[in-house]
Amino acid sequence: MLQRIKNLRKPKVETLNTINISRENIINNIKLIKSLKPDSWIFPVLKSNAYGHGILQILDILKEEKFPYIVVDSFPEYQIIHNNSNFKILIMWETLPENYRYFDYSRTSVAIYNLSTLNYLISLNKRIKIQLFLNTWMNREGIQEKDLERFLTLLKNNPKISLDWVMSHLYDADVEENHINLQIANFKKMYSIIEEYWFKPRWRHIGASAGICSIDDTFFNAWRPWLILYWYSPFSEEKELLKKLKPALSLTSSVISLQKLSPQDWVSYNHRWIADKDCWSATIPFWYYEWWLRNLAWKLTYYYHWKQLEQIWTICMNLSCCIADSNMKIWDKIELIGNDINKKNSIAIIAEQANTIPYEILIRLDRGIRRIVY
């Protein structure tokens, strides 16, 4: 309550750049995900600042729904969720041992794949819920089959540590010729060893966004949607199942300068762009500090209302330019990223122009840009 009063007293400072998050579209995506797995539990993934959408903003939307757990990957993200909601939290990746002293284990379950971490948790002498992260041949992290019984023996001898989950991660579920069935077979083989020790974990999960669309196996009773929560498909080709997803993020900037140009006038560094007719250029305060990669120069399309604007000249650290519309005024808004998949400033198109993937575009959006849920 005190914090709310303090916030009311703060001056409302408007920002030049704003990321807008559609509550309606996120809710739409949640409903679609639940419809794909109606008999399973859904654990939304908010790691990497909710893929650039903002943890607090997405958290505010998710409060309208019921989920057993919210998934994050780090201690700092755990703190944000814990301090701003009543959700239970699943930590997907390990942290430094000394940090485990600070978790609220009444609301937290942690992933384990190192014996040293498990031994440290045992030394805390607390009741702690854990999940065993199995290595089903991705070989990035996880418990190998040859080591599994050492973990199980420790758990059997230390009943304060409760095995509630078993999980793994798919390494090529987003391609047509994949090894999903091989990984599932490995998972089930290791799970049978867990059962031999008389453990009955509540949840079994191996699939994230691609797995939700690719696996139809009732053995798994939980799923971890990440990209598709925000609309972005993990597949290179569009899946019929995902056509009803809606992008939730758009980004606008503000015109801070308008310059009238004559033929042969140039713009910014090194005379890289020269006008071939009378025109105006508009400058906006957004470039590679805020995220845009330098290799996107000359490739982007901005929108002023529904009119396309060509981005021009080599970029600066905090500024970029485009051809201005004749009706444009100082402080007018320009849309840099749109949430319409058919427009040239969609995340998918920008990622293609940058020769990267949509995730990288999203997670690199500067955390300092104000994010607003509408």
Language model features with spans:
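Active-site anion/phosphate-binding pocket segments in diverse small-molecule metabolic enzymes
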Residues: 2-23, 27, 76, 95-97, ...
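Active-site-proximal beta-alpha core segment in soluble small-molecule metabolic enzymes
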Residues: 4, 13, 17-21, 25-27, ...
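Glycine-rich phosphate/diphosphate-binding loops that line cofactor/substrate pockets in enzymes
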Residues: 30-40
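Short secondary-structure boundary/capping segments within folded domains
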Residues: 34-36, 51, 275
